[in-house]
Amino acid sequence: MLAAQKQRITELFQAAVAPLVAGTELNPTVTLERPRDPSHGDVACNLAMQIAKPLKKNPREVAQVLVAALLDNPANRDLIESAEIAGPGFINLRLTPASRQSVVKTVLQQGAQYGKSNLGAGKKVIIEFVSANPTGPLHVGHGRQGALGDAMSSLFDAQGYAVTREFYYNDAGVQIATLATSVQARARGLKPGAEGWPESAYNGDYIQDIANDFLAKKTVSASDGLPVTASGDIDDIESIRAFAVAYLRREQDLDLQAFGVKFDNYYLESSLYNDGKVAATVDALIKADKTYELDGALWLRTTDYRDDKDRVMKKSDGTYTYFVPDVAYHTVKWQRGFTQAINVQGSDHHGTIARVRAGLQALDIGIPQGYPDYVLHKMVTVMRNGEEVKISKRAGSYVTLRDLIEWSNGETVEGQERDLTRGRDAVRFFLISRKADTEFVFDVDVALSQSDENPVYYVQYAHARICSVLAQWTDGDEAALLDVDLSPLTAPREAALLAKLAEYPEALQRALEELGPHQVAFYLRDLAAELHSYYNAERVLVDDVALKMARLTLMHATRQVLRNGLALIGVSAPARM
């Protein structure tokens, strides 16, 4: 059901119910839903049951009055074909064939804009995701964040929000110091396990690569950073630290580039300290009397803001706990004008939510409760050749995102330049194909298979099938399809496909409301299923010219919606498979 149709039906119900509630305090809300069973019609409404009890009337009798008024209203204008009363008082409506078919022309007229809206009206939204420590290659968990965060950003952008994609670099703290000593040890010729190897050092082969380039006095730079040239002095730990961080930021940039993810801004944790924002945040909380000292540490009264216990802000050794810069960072987000902030993070960050929100509330600068929003994802298990893969030689302790993209890409044809599109498509689609808060098993063998079991192949093949059919139609111009008579589209499979096309804008808005890009993947899988079922049941290029043209137009619209949905989640729409 298209938005314009939904609005018209809502207004018809409002007009029908007005006489029934006149003189009362009732102000019922018209809620329209799509029946789960298509045989029940196109639209379901429970309005009669909402008002029957307060009016002390039988809900079915109320429904009869509403239906009569609905169908008699001149504003109906061939929108509703029939209405039925079901169960205790549900009203099920069937749209006219012309109303169902109108989605095709809407899709063709709007093209890549179909499904988009101005719901956000330019409201500023910042979505932070990946935000990895620059201490190693991106892992599969970062990949899930990348897929979720980028798709979510595209969802908000499609609905008229002013979206900023931000990567927060945790470039301060113990882990960065560990990185520097790990590279220093490798530069001195030490190997993991050898005498003198630092405790808790990073063991991956990438540490040796950094050490080699440091000794060679090479220059590296991240996408938003100044070039950093290695000094080659193995005793200069600060030079090693700066070079190693820049090196790994560049490596992470390359991983994200292969994954098709681009950020609008990079924010360094170290800048919060260098610019005095962390100290200013702590001072503001002290002045507001939201802190106290105990056992040599500074505590924040987070229990005043729904946390289960107060939290240490500054330890007895003078260092800040990890949530303090987070509070400062989100204060900066608010001051930058982002009235909505969304963080996509691993589920291990669950414990930080209450304390960060408590710190923001304690500052009392107008930040609303529940700021920021969090989308937490669970772990990804990787299977390959029927076995779980836990360790990457490159990383030393985990499967990297680059590993997963390359494995899912398949073999390279000798003599051809390696194109990672197939692997990128598979990883991106797979990693948003489940709700973020569910654990996910990524089976590389499934990602490589050309079967219905592979969801990205299944959806892309639907698009390729349509391209093949349209390519066989050699006696016409696609632009002429805008004027085709669609009345011949009366087969049950055609009705199902038309209904699914009309659901696309609703699917996007549902995904936006739930902060759940998986809804887009679900929709695309369902649309592909309807297309495959239709393709197997009905011939498109039939002898009947009117029917052929109507079906070609339906195929063209379906291809457009598949393209729109795939583009939104960063997956290609190949013409051939």
Curated annotation (Swiss-Prot):
Sequence similarity: Belongs to the class-I aminoacyl-tRNA synthetase family.
UniProt key word Transferase: no
One Gene Ontology biological process: arginyl-tRNA aminoacylation
E.C. code: 6.1.1.19
GO cellular component: cytoplasm
Keywords linked to the UniProt accession: Aminoacyl-tRNA synthetase, ATP-binding, Cytoplasm, Ligase, Nucleotide-binding, Protein biosynthesis
Subunit structure: Monomer.
Catalysis performed (reactions): tRNA(Arg) + L-arginine + ATP = L-arginyl-tRNA(Arg) + AMP + diphosphate
Places the protein is found: Cytoplasm
The organism of origin for this protein: Herminiimonas arsenicoxydans
Domain of life: Bacteria
Keyword Ligase attached: yes
Protein name as catalogued: Arginine--tRNA ligase
Motif ('HIGH' region): 132-142
SUPFAM superfamilies (UniProt xref): Anticodon-binding domain of a subclass of class I aminoacyl-tRNA synthetases, Arginyl-tRNA synthetase (ArgRS), N-terminal 'additional' domain, Nucleotidylyl transferase
Pfam families reported for this sequence: Arg_tRNA_synt_N, DALR_1, tRNA-synt_1d
Family annotation (InterPro entries): aa-tRNA-synth_I_CS, Arg-tRNA-ligase, Arg-tRNA-synth_N, Arg-tRNA-synth_N_sf, ArgRS_core, DALR_anticod-bd, Rossmann-like_a/b/a_fold, tRNAsynth_Ia_anticodon-bd
GO molecular function, one term: arginine-tRNA ligase activity
